């Protein structure tokens, strides 16, 4: 691959409401692929696309037509040189983070964790995975592997399985099993831990004063379980950890926990 092709493969694009086409036309919602999207994906060898709620339709057939069109664009040999199938992703955690219109409304992670039965997480993951697979989505940015150890956290809360690292770890593993049984990849998030914050990282930059040793005892426990369970990716958090150097965690766990090749970073 050329450098340009490698860059394209590392990019994950979103086509959402408010998107402006090259001719100045504004699109209110992108639920069908158009010629311009086809050209962008094919010409620049784009590797991934993320879909949000605005991209999904209550009619599953419309969703399938969208994902099928995206894949055809990626495989268009008249535009791109590689013709590599796309990763098509979404955030379908269950509970309050729910993108797939028409999908099954499931209890959130906190409710699953409170049940004490990891089989509930397997079943939830299986339902989510089967529905994503049915509409052509092959990556689920889930499970949320954060430990809910700050009651003032404005963005995680119900999305976490538990404030207990060991319990959260068991449910993270179970959820991964369910999703992956449907040939859908998982991405445990938000590494190295988004639970102990009091600021929403979508609107500010949280700072976590934990030391590396403290992270290994608490926040990293569910992520270790996720890796052991075979998660396909890990999504990083956009959070400050002033008492550690993130590279140390990558270095310490290069083979055991996480490799940079499987890290997903999100810019919105």
Segments from the language model and where they lie:
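Flexible glycine-/small-residue-enriched beta->alpha junction loops
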Residues: 99-103, 107-113
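Short, acidic/polar
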Residues: 22-42, 121-131, 215-222
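N-terminal hydrophobic targeting/anchoring segments and the immediately downstream early-domain regions
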Residues: 1-99
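A cross-family glycoside hydrolase active-site/sugar-binding cleft signature
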Residues: 14, 50-52, 89-91, 142-143, ...
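Solvent-exposed loop/turn segments at secondary-structure junctions
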Residues: 17-20, 54-58, 92-97, 139, ...
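A substrate-binding/cap region within the structured catalytic cores of diverse enzymes
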Residues: 85, 113-137, 142-166, 172, ...
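Loop/turn elements at helix/coil->beta-strand transitions in domains of secreted/extracellular proteins
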Residues: 3-10, 44-49, 82-86, 133-139, ...
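Second-shell residues forming the walls of enzyme active-site clefts
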Residues: 2, 25-28, 33, 59-75, ...
